């Protein structure tokens, strides 16, 4: 391959560039990013950056020395608008066309918005999003309504509460994170909200947003109305695949690819939040750093030589606690606390470790403020999973 183009200049795109050079690719390397910034770390946006404990210069994932060493052409602040797979060209929004022999799709995802939501309803996905919300939060005490009790919603609510704002979280399900963690551990997350001084309203949705110039209230399906100065939505993300419409790639909640991140076209792979690898779109920091290794191996080989089905892992920092989860939860799994304790459906002072069991086997582990026991349990889970697939 004479030219490889990476579309997407965030975490997965950067790791793909590193892997290409690490695996010996010495041809032309082009990285296209729709944001004007070099790659930056997104997890702190809802936490330390929002609260002012971290500034923008601490978010950088790379520096000038590494960028020079990668010998890549960085085309930042320009969006890809199309892909011609027959001509092997990437069409850019500024009118330029890039001819490429290999393509890494790493375009990530965009925060999902409420239908018809006005511009002053905040999301938190990009640095621009975080800048805008941080500026609003420094204007003085505000009544904040967070729509969505997932990880982004919970982390954002915790940060707003830490800054002294009056915060309410709305979650349509009976408990936050119920599909991801199951009822026992979802109840723990609910307790963290309560302990953090945040009101949690579950089991109801949003019917409309009341405005008087800007948003002033959130109207709920149960008939109640919440007064709000700031409204934030954390209701998931949509993979950035619109630019691939009309290409020969198969799309469906992401770019469909095998467990080696290879698409049906040998010269195209996908990584990160946009990749639906082996039937799953992982959407986690760890996946974005691990997938590029096998993707690049297969891209350079022109066929799938390497596959990876790691045990899913994610973490979340909220209300001064770190939640870590590894594995695959399924409704009906038995959950046992094996270290530490639960007090009133919340973590004890020293945290806890819980195991999810199915048919006598551990299939997932969750810890709150127990990093070392969790690391051991995660390794054990990984060994078990590897044995099961050999």
Label each region the model flagged.
Residues 2-72, 159-180:
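Beta1-alpha1 glycine-rich phosphate/pyrophosphate-binding loop at the start
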């Amino acid at each position: 391959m004479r030219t490889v183009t990476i579309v997407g200049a965030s975490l997965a795109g950067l790791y793909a560039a590193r892997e290409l050079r690490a695996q010996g690719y010495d041809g032309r390397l082009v990285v296209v990013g729709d944001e004007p910034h070099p790659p930056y770390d997104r997890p702190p946006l809802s936490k330390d950056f929002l609260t002012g404990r971290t500034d923008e210069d601490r978010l950088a994932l790379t520096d000038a020395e590494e960028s020079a060493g990668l010998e890549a052409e960085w085309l930042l602040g320009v969006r890809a608008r199309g892909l011609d797979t027959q001509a092997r060209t990437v069409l850019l929004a500024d009118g330029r066309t890039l001819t490429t022999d290999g393509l890494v799709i790493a375009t990530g995802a965009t925060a999902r918005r409420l239908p018809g939501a006005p511009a002053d309803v905040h999301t938190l996905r990009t640095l621009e999003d975080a800048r805008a919300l941080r500026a609003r939060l420094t204007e003085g005490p505000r009544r904040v309504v967070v729509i969505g009790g997932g990880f982004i919603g919970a982390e954002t609510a915790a940060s707003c509460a830490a800054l002294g704002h009056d915060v309410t979280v709305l979650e349509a399900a009976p408990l936050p994170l119920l599909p991801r963690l199951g009822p026992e551990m979802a109840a723990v997350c609910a307790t963290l909200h309560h302990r953090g001084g945040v009101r949690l309203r579950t089991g109801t949705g949003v019917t409309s947003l009341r405005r008087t110039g800007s948003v002033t209230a959130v109207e709920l399906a149960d008939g109640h109305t919440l007064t709000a100065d700031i409204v934030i939505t954390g209701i998931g993300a949509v993979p950035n695949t619109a630019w691939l419409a009309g290409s020969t790639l198969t799309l469906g909640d992401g770019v469909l690819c095998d467990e080696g991140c290879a698409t049906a076209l040998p010269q195209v792979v996908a990584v990160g939040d946009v990749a639906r690898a082996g039937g799953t779109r992982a959407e986690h920091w760890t996946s974005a750093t691990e997938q590029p290794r096998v993707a690049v191996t297969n891209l350079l080989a022109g066929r799938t030589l390497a596959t990876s089905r790691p045990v899913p892992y994610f973490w979340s920092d909220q209300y001064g606690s770190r939640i870590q989860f590894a594995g695959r939860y399924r409704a009906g799994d038995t959950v046992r606390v094996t270290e530490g304790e639960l007090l009133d459906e919340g973590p004890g002072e020293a945290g806890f470790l819980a195991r999810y069991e199915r048919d006598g086997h551990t299939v997932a582990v969750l810890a709150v403020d127990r990093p070392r026991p969790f690391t051991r349990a995660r390794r054990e889970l990984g060994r078990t999973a590897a044995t099961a697939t050999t």
